[in-house]
Amino acid sequence: MNSKERHEARYLRRKAKRDLAKQKRNEGHTFDVVTSPESLRRAFYSARKGVNWKASVQRYGVNVLRNCIDTSEKIRHGENISKGFIEFDISERGKKRHITSVHISERVVQKSVCDNGIVPVMEKSLIYDNGASQKGKGTDFARERLKKHLHQFYRKYGTDGYILLGDCHDFFGSIDHSIVKRNMEKMITDQRLIDLAMQFVDPFPRGLGLGSQVCQILAVTYQNEIDHCIKEVWRKKWYARYMDDFYVICRTKDEAKELLAYFIEKYREYGIELNLSKTQIVKLTHGFVWLQDRIYLLPTGRIVDKPGRSSLVRNRRKLKKIAKRVDRGEIPFNNALTFYNSHIGYLSHKDAYHAIKNVDKLFNDLFIRRFMYEQVRYA
């Protein structure tokens, strides 16, 4: 056996091993399991959380088993279960977002597709530092990973370093459907399950919609190849991504610039454009913003995590609006107290001593002191 034959034999052995592992990952996560009435029934009880007060959800739940059986039969006979979208706009942190929500009958199917099919198979291929839309992860997880990366960098190099912060322009609206399908085909063996998932993607002429669980999960896995390339080819262990936001901690500014050029080129291949007004290279000692928090690495190695100024201003304004609605009798005082406790609870996890004092003072001025003044005046 010559060298070429040995290489070919080794390749075939490794390919067979990968195919076997792929087959094992897909066991129990097939089209038949996803579309079974029992899976759909469990998906309904999970999907109704937080929205059980809606009349449409209650109507579906009255005959949940009958509805699940009918839906299962329709899917297996190749019928289209889509009833169109419920479209509306919301304002999130001053940014207008267009939401495309689906009816409860379709949401149940999406829940089953995600929980019983896509997520158990595809999440195993994600890097650990991909923190969005996964059980046990989230914004707090992403912030803690950043702090851990900064501590690791400091122990090795001190504060002499830079961080590349990246942000994408119109991320959901730029996603290529062919790449989404290619990513699923790499991990999922059941073609019928892939076709079912694509039924929730294809109605969008371009990109993916906000408000769909399937679209949310597929967006998380969209740049998975780039994530692995940064971690394994570039050997950047201090890299993390949260949906369309990412960071890389680098030794030098030139290294960060080289990575930025790679991201611009690679993201362009995926149809995504980096928002260069928000993408920046910052010296670690200068402080930077990550997921709405202002982060500082001090010369002692201590990390200061302060809430972003924009979120503080936004919540102060919201508290003032709530106070006006309480005065007009539109909402009870308990609503204001709930918002105040929630905001203080968030700030208590930050280095925000003065911010907490300012919120306390504002709440007292809006509610407590004014109430006491009126009690004295009318006594």
Predicted features along the sequence, with ranges:
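Conserved polymerase palm-domain catalytic core
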Residues: 144-243, 247-264, 282, 330, ...
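Reverse-transcriptase-like RNA-dependent polymerase core
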Residues: 71-95, 108, 115, 189-203
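Conserved phosphate/pyrophosphate-binding and hydrolysis machinery centered on Walker-type P-loop NTPases
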Residues: 57, 61, 136, 208, ...
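Right-hand nucleic-acid polymerase module
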Residues: 1-9, 13-14, 102, 107, ...
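Active-site-proximal segment of RNA-dependent polymerases
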Residues: 30, 114-173
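Short Gly/Ser/Thr- and Asp/Glu-enriched loop/turn motifs at secondary-structure junctions
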Residues: 85, 240-244, 277
